[in-house]
Amino acid sequence: MRIDVLTLFPEMFSIFNHSIIGRAIEKEILKINTVNIRDYTIDKHKKVDDYPYGGGAGMVMSVQPIVDSIKAVKKENKGKVIFLGPKGKTFNQNLAKELAKEEELIFLCGHYEGIDERAYEYIDMEISLGDFVLTGGEMACIPIVDSICRLVDGVLGSSESYEDESFYNGLLEYPQYTRPAIYEGKSVPEVLLSGHHENIKKWRKAKSLIITDKVRPDLFKKYKLTEEDKKILKDFNKKL
């Protein structure tokens, strides 16, 4: 997958040179480029923003450098142009799965009080991270790109690495434990030490269902319980 990020602060994306995403870039599974929007302004002072027509607080990103940077990137990247903004669809795991199927994507990070409305003609999709205010689009772009990239084939060791994670199947993840088996009198659940893979699988599914119901009832309501799920919960509750 190729991703180009249009931003005023390209240095913020150096985080992708590390850990799982960094290794995927080294293996050429991913290619993440940053493009400085400021490089495309025709203003002699390198300005990329101006006062809003009609008055108001703050500054607005100018249409010219935004559009010219999009056009330049589009010569090599034919993917959707995604703007990180408050009017967009709220990002979630399902949207991450859909975007992970794309071969190319372009992200546009806004700043200041927003972008000139005329730039929207060059934008295919707007995504919001949530109902809260951030300093700039970069803050939203980083977790969104990370979430998408980890679902690209080959980025993680195996599909099991992300299929068991919270949200992937509509549920929160089960509890995790590592050594020591006993710490300050608190023991790891016996089933996890048993080596019985089927029982471990059922325990994890039961805990995942119970935790989701308790912590995120909104997610649990959307989840469709199978007959196997119901049996796992029934058997789990009998052992309590």
From Swiss-Prot:
It is found in: Cytoplasm. One of its GO terms (cellular component) is cytosol. S-adenosyl-L-methionine binds at G110, L129, G130, D131, F132, V133, L134. It comes from Clostridium botulinum (strain Hall / ATCC 3502 / NCTC 13319 / Type A). Specifically methylates guanosine-37 in various tRNAs. This is tRNA (guanine-N(1)-)-methyltransferase. It holds the Pfam family tRNA_m1G_MT. The keyword Transport does not apply.
